[in-house]
Amino acid sequence: MNKIRKFFRGSGRVLAFIFVASVIWLLFDMAALRLSFSEINTGILKEDIMRREQTGFRVEADQMTILSPSSRGMRPPRNGAGGKESFRKAENRVLKVEENVDQVQRKGKMQFLLGRGKAVSLWHRTHVQTLPVTLPMQKTQGRDSKPEVSSLHMMSKQTTVLGSEKDSFTVSRGVPLNKTAEHTETLDKKQEAPENYNLSSDTSKQASQRALNVTISVRTDRSKQQSQTVTKSSIQFASLPILKPEEVTVTKKTEAQGKDLKYEAHKARPLLKFTADVGHLKKQSTNETGLGVLPEADGAKVAPGKKLNFSESQIVIITKEEGQKTDTKEVPNSKIQTVFPKLLGESQGKHIPRSQSQTLSSPLAPKRAVSQSKPTLAEELHTARSNLTAKATTVGHQQSHANISENPGKHHVLRIDVTLSPRDLNAPGQFGRPVVVPPGKKKEAEQRWKEGNFNVYLSDLIPVDRAIEDTRPAGCAEQLVHNDLPTTSIIMCFVDEVWSALLRSVHSVLNRSPPHLIKEILLVDDFSTKDYLKANLDKYMSQFPKVRILRLKERHGLIRARLAGAQNATGDVLTFLDSHVECNVGWLEPLLERVYLNRKKVACPVIEVINDKDMSYMTVDNFQRGVFTWPMNFGWRTIPPDVIAKNGIKETDIIRCPVMAGGLFSIDKSYFYELGTYDPGLDVWGGENMELSFKVWMCGGEIEIIPCSRVGHIFRNDNPYSFPKDRMKTVERNLVRVAEVWLDEYKELFYGHGDHLIDQGLDVGNLTQQRELRKKLKCQSFKWYLDNVFPDLKAPVVRASGVFINLALGKCVSIKNITVVLEDCDGSSELQQFNYTWVRLIKHGEWCVAPIPDKGSLTLYPCDNRNNRLKWLHRSASAFHPELVDHIVFESYQQLLCMEGNFSQKTLKLAACNPTEPQQKWKFEKYYDV
């Protein structure tokens, strides 16, 4: 004690008291300051919450925070120059989940749902609103029941607003989505890179860290909610125009992509929704996975018919053989189990049956939990609508190589639009806007038009990964699809395609498709001659592990090029696309869902228009289907409004399609080969869509147009591709081959509308194998197709039928032995029944009326569609001789000779045509129009 007391003697005592008082004062000061900060923060939070509730949680321009400088969007080089190959590099990492939730997040006052905003239709005024995410409990086979990640939450200042909310209106076919903000672009114009914005929270404890904080909310019941924070360092998002601030894309880098890849999330106009709808799923990587070694031989063979083998001497395959496996990483929480994909090593390249998908994962797909409940697909709600909408399909149908699992999980269609670098929002053509050629460049644009038969100059100005508006009908984003959809191989065939158009097609697939569903993208080069499509294309595509290039060593044409791609495809489903398209958001899953439900369904997207002059993206009518008119001319026909109203057809209803356009569709690979693929006897291009459409429908399959799948396509007035032979004759030959195999007796209707086709005597090749294939598949007749698939097509077998009357005499033509005579009319007499066919024969059974050579009297000859001496013109002669409309003119002679009746002798003969002679005027009992 004495030692202690001496410190408090004299001046030491004063210093001790001063020190103690200072410490106490400092403690009180810090406590007061902390209370002050808490009150200020609480007030700010309350004001912020009230303001966001009033404005729909929109972030104003003054609230944007800078994340990192953005790089200028890469442009395709002119004339095929190489593009940037270093920007597509990123390091594959596994998402880590750690518990770090503060009080505000647990109460949910600054949280909002991700990726689940309701789609806004372009055809009806719709109020944009946020829908809650609630999914049933999930489980995996062989494991305890675990709740599935049901929603993602982010903090307040995470996205940016580019425009104000607008109402949407009805848009007819061919109407551009953006009629304003046209751009005039010059080659020397410099574009400023848009600012990037920080994905962070003012209230989060990690606000100062350079990391993305996303809260995963797991619902165990309606009253309790647990959350975890997923922290992924050094990750940014693509510059994505999105509808709501709730929407965000969760991405993952690959080892093949390097560390300099930047992703960034942006907000755009209310009608634009370019984001991944991942709020209700396990975190899904958007990386490009490596491709396994290509098998030496594809197991699928060409069905009966000419086998088309592409040997090593015919095809050069450019590929990246990078293997991979998947592994799982569990979230360290007793109540949560999240499974993520992890790259390990070489892939076995084997297909895992869907029945095992709950315990095993495909090499290219992450593992997924399986839902306990059975939610109903939205597209199955509207069925059997007057033969126009698709019929409901039960799960009894089997997918090739796999059975549909008894209780598969489902999720909402993912709305993915991930770019490799931030988009330049002011770039020409961005968001599908029209572009105007600068006055000084019009001559150059005209000269370059012939390179692709569209505005190549503007195509090169537009970014290869431009944004386009989400044109899907309202409700598409809320539709459910199965978690274990089959993988698909995208097959694009091209020859001398425009560089920018080809790149834009590939980027649209990569940017807007769930990566685990894309097994590969096969670019089949049908012996292009352009230099930029050789080494430069190989170099550019080398940055995408899933893109492979197949080079044919000679020109085969589109049909055989597609067959080459199909033989080398490894996916469960084949998806054929043209090389000048732009796939819209959410395009792929609805197609695969239909094939998943029934392997004999062929799913087609709604094909929208990319204007060939200003490159604007234009929407089309929702209620269109592919049809044909005689002689097999493909076209689009809108379902009449009264039929739509009567049957209650909705914009999201699937449409039964009698004939598909042929350029864009998905088909089960094994079913494609069961059908015999394309007829290998078809040359180059033309008629293949008709042949496959008839084959699918008549042999037990279905063709559907899926309104929730949209793909833009450049429609050109002329085909720029060269044909080994005459283009028109090649197409006509293909159509004749199709007609001879599939149209049965209705082929006369085909020839009647293209009479020159039968006269030319085209060599269509051997049809034996195709006819045997039809018998083997036990296909229906063409009459069945007309009655059940395309009943609104007018297809009378003959032009006219019944009794054959002379107008002046009132007598009818009759058969006596093998001669033709005039008698009193008797409609019940078989001897007076005649048909006037589409190939201009007057038939009685298998006999045809014709003049006896050099005599002029008429008799019967065996019918032969190719014998011009049996053909007569009736009513069709009005085109060049309107005064002879009621006459029957014999074709074979140069002089106009007409059939004339002589009642006194009861005979018929040929005489010089006389428009005023009443005995030369005839009429059939019934006439049929088309």
UniProtKB/Swiss-Prot annotation:
Bridged cysteine pairs (disulfide): 476-708, 699-779, 812-825, 848-863, 898-913
Catalyzed chemical reaction(s): L-seryl-[protein] + UDP-N-acetyl-alpha-D-galactosamine = a 3-O-[N-acetyl-alpha-D-galactosaminyl]-L-seryl-[protein] + UDP + H(+); L-threonyl-[protein] + UDP-N-acetyl-alpha-D-galactosamine = a 3-O-[N-acetyl-alpha-D-galactosaminyl]-L-threonyl-[protein] + UDP + H(+)
Enzyme class: transferase
GO cellular component: Golgi apparatus; Golgi membrane
Region of interest called Catalytic subdomain B, as start-end residue ranges on this chain: 654-716
Pathway: Protein modification; protein glycosylation
Subunit structure of this chain's protein: Interacts with EXT2. Does not interact with EXT1, EXTL1 or EXTL3.
Name by which UniProt lists this protein: Polypeptide N-acetylgalactosaminyltransferase 5
